[in-house]
Amino acid sequence: MENSPIFNDFIPGALVRCPSQPNWGIGQVQSCINGKVTINFENVGKKVIDLMFINLELIENAG
């Protein structure tokens, strides 16, 4: 599961947005393990997102 193309987009340093929670602002990916992405969002701090249930929009790849 960790090698799925969708999970590979969310590497540490990538910038993302959660379309269902626009007030969270832009977040920076901290880690992605087994489809769970830890993100530090500008307006709400750290959140752990399960990609099986919540969609994320990739804004910018890391590096």
Annotated model-derived regions:
Residues M1-L15, N23:
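Mixed-charge, Lys/Arg-rich low-complexity intrinsically disordered regions
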Residues V37-E42:
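SH3/SH3-like beta-barrel fold
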Residues M1-S4, K46-G63:
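Intrinsically disordered, low-complexity, charged/polar segments
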Residues G25-C32:
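Short beta-strand-centered aromatic/proline hotspots
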Residues N34-G35, I54:
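Beta-strand-connecting loop/turn residues
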